[in-house]
Amino acid sequence: MFYKIAQKVMFQMDPEKAHNLAIGSLKSTANSPLNCFYAQKLQAAPVEFMGLTFPNPVGLAAGMDKDGECIDAFHAMGFGHVEVGTVTPRPQPGNDQPRLFRLKPAKAIINRMGFNNKGVDNLVANLKAAKSGAMVGVNIGKNKDTPVEQGKEDYLICMEKVYPYAAYIAVNISSPNTPGLRSLQYGDLLDDLLGSLKAKQKDLAERHGKYVPIALKIAPDLEPDEIEKIAESLIRNEFDGAIATNTTLTRDGVSGLVNSNEAGGLSGKPLNSLSTKVIKQLADCLKGQVPIIGVGGINSAADALDKLDAGATMVQIYSGFIYRGPELIKEIVDAYRVKSK
């Protein structure tokens, strides 16, 4: 009920201003009696993924809490994990505003944020300050002004800094809003990146005395042969997990709507079937050797279960969470519990 009222107010505002207001409000009320407006206790529905045990299969996708400012608040809502980021080595402002657009009739969002964040050192401070014991994944990327050929170094810098504080690390090479980034999904550039990250992981595991799994986040705009090559590279480099998918550059299901011609990645309900299709293709190629988090367009428990049936082990929500609120978390967890009996 409270979320519906808050949503009505925020949907009258500019989307980015509403986002910043929400983050500020959650940050100031976390771990206080005021979190009663959004906190909910969910029944346990544990899931094993990448060698870790998560309290339930529903996570918050990267992009909502880029700087890790509201980890405890999102944990209180019942998320089984919170993926923060995308974070880059140095702070950067992202693309010019406006850069975030609602397509309300389609329950969709277009964004061209461009990895706006306060930098990895700021994120690490927030990870250290979190009190809830939430399972936190850290989504890492490269700075816009780092040439793609040197992008690997940005990922290694971020990985080294967040490693001691992350439950897992997600490698984002699939945002459409950083020029050239998606080229890292192909051929030698991909193999070189994954191999370097695995070598770094081995070094950091020995140094810190703990193994932090790493997962690759891929785009939905891939041909079947491209998905197959990514799967082969994941297996060859012994990656721990995959996250499918990021936002799409297609505009299926939104043509003619206000804001549908804006540049950027489309998320929300229109992405659902495409991302589920990619999950199925990826799962078929991986043959159980690398587990998958399914994300993209989940707006109901049925959408989430479809992704699990397609081959995902866990799911993440973002746009659906904006449109539905914390009730969507509970709805999916309850459906998962019934399915798992």
Curated annotation (Swiss-Prot):
Reactions catalysed, as given in the entry: (S)-dihydroorotate + a quinone = orotate + a quinol
Keyword Protein biosynthesis listed: no
Q: What's its top-level EC category?
A: oxidoreductase
> Which amino acids does the record list as binding substrate?
66, 111-115, 172, 177, 246-247
Cytoplasm keyword on record: no
Q: Where is the signal peptide?
A: none
Cofactor detail note: Binds 1 FMN per subunit.
- What does the record give as EC number? 1.3.5.2
Q: State a GO cellular component annotated for this protein.
A: plasma membrane
Q: In which pathway does it act?
A: Pyrimidine metabolism; UMP biosynthesis via de novo pathway; orotate from (S)-dihydroorotate (quinone route): step 1/1
Q: Source organism's superkingdom?
A: Bacteria
- Might you name a Gene Ontology BP term for this protein? 'de novo' pyrimidine nucleobase biosynthetic process
Report the function annotation for this chain: Catalyzes the conversion of dihydroorotate to orotate with quinone as electron acceptor.
Q: What is this protein called?
A: Dihydroorotate dehydrogenase (quinone)
Taxonomic lineage per UniProt?
Answer: Bacteria, Pseudomonadati, Pseudomonadota, Gammaproteobacteria, Alteromonadales
* Gene (UniProt): pyrD
